[in-house]
Amino acid sequence: MGQQPAKSMDVRRIEGGELLLNQLAGRMIPKGTVTWSGKFPTIDHLLDHVQTMEEVNTLQQQGAWPAGAGRRLGLTNPAPQEPPQPQWTPEEDQKAREAFRRYQEERPPETTTIPPTSPTPWKLQPGDDPLLENKSLLETHPLYQNPEPAVPVIKTPPLRKKKMAGTFGGILAGLIGLLVGFFLLIKILEILRRLDWWWISLSSPKGKMQCAFQDTGAQISPHYAGFCPWGCPGFLWTYLRLFIIFLLILLVAAGLLYLTDNMSIILGKLQWESVSALFSSISSLLPSDQKSLVALMFGLLLIWMTSSSATQTLVTLTQLATLSALFYKN
């Protein structure tokens, strides 16, 4: 009772080989604590694995594996049985040769085939395919077309947000421009009046500087020529003289511009070495930056407008020398 049949020698050899492989494989499996990363074995595990594999290779080279014991590690049998080689008798070999010869004779002859020609390239014209007319599959397919909304949507253009800083800056710039223009207009009229007074003083004696039109019966107070109020007949003549003086100034400015274009020719003919040396020395002292030149001329203009007659004469001479040197430099 309870007796099991005796195991054969082959079964015992297989079981013994499996026990040996289990012991060897147990040494290759890391046991105990692992490293801080939790992924790699320690150096002791690696050394055990190397030693175990050396023993396994030694046993395999010696052919010490029992039959069927290599399936645990996937190792092949070190001494596999060679497959039986087919043995052909001369009669069987002759029969095979005869059968192959008959097959070659009975085989139908090959028909001459035409080599395949390369297909002609297919080129689409713009009118052949709707995809080439700036459309896509999604646009042409009815399922992907945008359906019309049930409620009409009114699209309004986006309103641009105006920045208060930009608006205030534009208004401030406009006010400053008007103020500067009004100031320059007043100063230009003042300059023209002074030139007109100088002209009158040259052509009239000092005792007769009063307006000649104030004795024509107009109800106006006594005044000097060139300062006629509204209602005096000399008012229009005064502004006519101012306009003539303004035209003369423009003519002088145009002449200076013409001289700047032909300065080298004129200086070459007149041989003004001293003048050219003076202009070159002044131009060497001038700044090269245009903004600095504008600031210099504007500063001289402000000094001229807010100073006395003697200082204005000096500033005027300085301005003329600076402009002449600047024209000579250019």
Swiss-Prot record:
Keywords: Fusion of virus membrane with host membrane, Glycoprotein, Host-virus interaction, Lipoprotein, Membrane, Myristate, Phosphoprotein, Transmembrane, Transmembrane helix, Viral attachment to host cell, Viral envelope protein, Viral penetration into host cytoplasm, Virion, Virus entry into host cell. Myristoylation contributes importantly to DHBV infectivity. It is most likely required for an early step of the life cycle involving the entry or uncoating of virus particles. Phosphorylated on pre-S domain for about 50% of L proteins, the L chains with internal pre-S region (Li-HBsAg). It is found in: Virion membrane. Residues 2-165, 260-292 are extracellular. The keyword Glycoprotein applies. Residues 2-238, 187-238, 314-330 are cytoplasmic. A lipid is attached at residue 2 (N-myristoyl glycine). Residues 92-109 have a biased composition (Basic and acidic residues). Residues 2-163 are annotated as: Pre-S. GO terms for cellular component: membrane; viral envelope; virion membrane. The record marks 240-241 as: Cleavage. Glycans are attached at residue 262. The chain crosses the membrane at residues 166-186, 239-259, 293-313. GO terms for biological process: membrane fusion involved in viral entry into host cell; symbiont entry into host cell; virion attachment to host cell. InterPro entries: HBV_HBSAG. Residues 68-123 are annotated as: Disordered. It comes from the Viruses. Belongs to the avihepadnavirus major surface antigen family. Large internal envelope protein interacts with capsid protein. The large envelope protein exists in two topological conformations, one which is termed 'external' or Le-HBsAg and the other 'internal' or Li-HBsAg. In its external conformation the protein attaches the virus to cell receptors and thereby initiating infection. This interaction determines the species specificity and liver tropism. The large envelope protein probably also assumes fusion between virion and host membranes. In its internal conformation the protein plays a role in virion morphogenesis and mediates the contact with the nucleocapsid like a matrix protein. Truncated S protein may be involved in translocation of pre-S domain through the virion membrane. The large envelope protein is synthesized with the pre-S region at the cytosolic side of the endoplasmic reticulum and, hence will be within the virion after budding. Therefore the pre-S region is not N-glycosylated. Later a post-translational translocation of N-terminal pre-S and TM1 domains occur in about 50% of proteins at the virion surface. These molecules change their topology by an unknown mechanism, resulting in exposure of pre-S region at virion surface. This is Large envelope protein. It comes from Duck hepatitis B virus (isolate white Shanghai duck S31).
